[in-house]
Amino acid sequence: MSTTMETTKISQQDDLWKNMELGQISDEEVRRLMKIGIEKRIKWGTKPTQQEQLAQLLDFNKSLRGMKMATEIDTLENHKIYETPESFNQIIGGKESAGLFTDETTTTMEEANTKMMDLYCERAGLKDGHTILDLGCGAGLLVLHLAKKYKKSKITGITNTSSHKEYILKQCKNLNLSNVEIILADVTKVDIESTFDRVFVIGLIEHMKNFELFLRKISKWMKDDGLLLLEHLCHKSFSDHWEPLSEDDWYAKNFFPSGTLVIPSATCLLYFQEDVTVIDHWILSGNNFARSNEVILKRIDGKIEEVKDIFMSFYGIGREEAVKLINWWRLLCITANELFKYNNGEEWLISQLLFKKKLMTCI
């Protein structure tokens, strides 16, 4: 392709994204374009033989081991998906990860989130009195759930977002919870002397690069008999740095800085057991994440004027920028919905792994 044609194509895609941000492209057209992108990504990642598929996974894992723990923390420190207003968190349900939609009777984010968090507790074998660490705790939905459910436990959450810390501590005060500590820190740099009975890492490893270094760091915070429950989004077969595959790959290009998001394969983390050992592994349908985003989209649309005012006040932006930010969130929900419901939720999935600490043995 000539340089002129490439420049024209880039310009067309930039115009497309600008029109999407302004809400000038219909949801139906966005979904159609997303499906085209999904099929291109599947074609790119799916190899003709199982041996080639395995080789792709092993090469990907090898490349991760040569990287630093994470590349995006500074880039995304004030990213709009993390630094969000308290009132907006309440509108969307307070959690960016998937809820558990076990059947058609589950319709609200609150119910789905509670079901998923109860599943975490069950699979981690939580008991009242356990010390618990929630890495990348976000707006604190899991922290608060655990603090209310396990009154004798001490729950520590780590977030790199000051507004989230303030919100969680405010909720603890309102709920009269005294068993919560929130640490404001970059998880890749923070040093904690304490060790914990249970560690939760929900929707965080997708923002890491060197999984070996990350899991080694976590293992140092686990008691000898401690357990780690880790959840991540995944593809059934291939791992992906989520970089644009071409100039028209608008959805991979515009939501996160290029290459800062990792979507591992369903089996990727099984190859990183230097410091922790997998003792159980579950795969949940991608429909859970698809429906979560569908519900969030409806909640945003149902209070769109309120959301606009919230964004203008919190970020100190004008009406046009607030509209763009609302459309950014809407587009994120639409694309995630299409991605995770593809192939009836059996293409992109949710992986949950339970690890124990690997203890040093003397010979």
From Swiss-Prot:
Q: What is its EC number?
A: 2.1.1.337
Q: Name one GO biological process term.
A: methylation
Q: Which Pfam families match?
A: CMAS (PF02353)
Q: How does activity depend on temperature?
A: Optimum temperature is 30 degrees Celsius.
Q: Which residues form a coiled coil?
A: none
UniProt entry keywords in alphabetical sequence: Methyltransferase, S-adenosyl-L-methionine, Transferase
Annotated tissue distribution: Expressed in roots and stems. Detected in leaves and flower buds.
Question: Which positions does UniProt annotate for S-adenosyl-L-methionine binding?
Answer: 96-97, 132-140, 159-164
- pH dependence as annotated: Optimum pH is 8.5 with (R)-reticuline as substrate. Optimum pH is 7.0-9.0 with (S)-reticuline as substrate.
| Disulphide linkage map | none
Catalyses which reaction(s): (S)-reticuline + S-adenosyl-L-methionine = (S)-tembetarine + S-adenosyl-L-homocysteine + H(+); (R)-reticuline + S-adenosyl-L-methionine = (R)-tembetarine + S-adenosyl-L-homocysteine + H(+); (S)-corytuberine + S-adenosyl-L-methionine = magnoflorine + S-adenosyl-L-homocysteine; (S)-tetrahydropapaverine + S-adenosyl-L-methionine = (S)-N-methyltetrahydropapaverine + S-adenosyl-L-homocysteine + H(+)
Top-tier EC class = transferase
GO molecular function annotations of the record: S-adenosyl-L-methionine:(S)-corytuberine-N-methyltransferase activity
Q: Which domain of life is it from?
A: Eukaryota
Q: Which family does it belong to?
A: Belongs to the CFA/CMAS family.
Function, as annotated, reads: N-methyltransferase accepting primarily 1-benzylisoquinoline and aporphine substrates possessing a tertiary amine. The preferred substrates are (R)- and (S)-reticuline and (S)-corytuberine, but can also use (R,S)-tetrahydropapaverine, papaverine, (+)-bulbocapnine, (+)-glaucine, (+)-isocorydine, (+)-isothebaine, boldine, noscapine, narcotine hemiacetal and hydrastine as substrates. Involved in the biosynthesis of magnoflorine.
Instruction: Give the protein name, as stated in the record.
Output: Reticuline N-methyltransferase
Question: Whose protein is this, by species?
Answer: Papaver somniferum
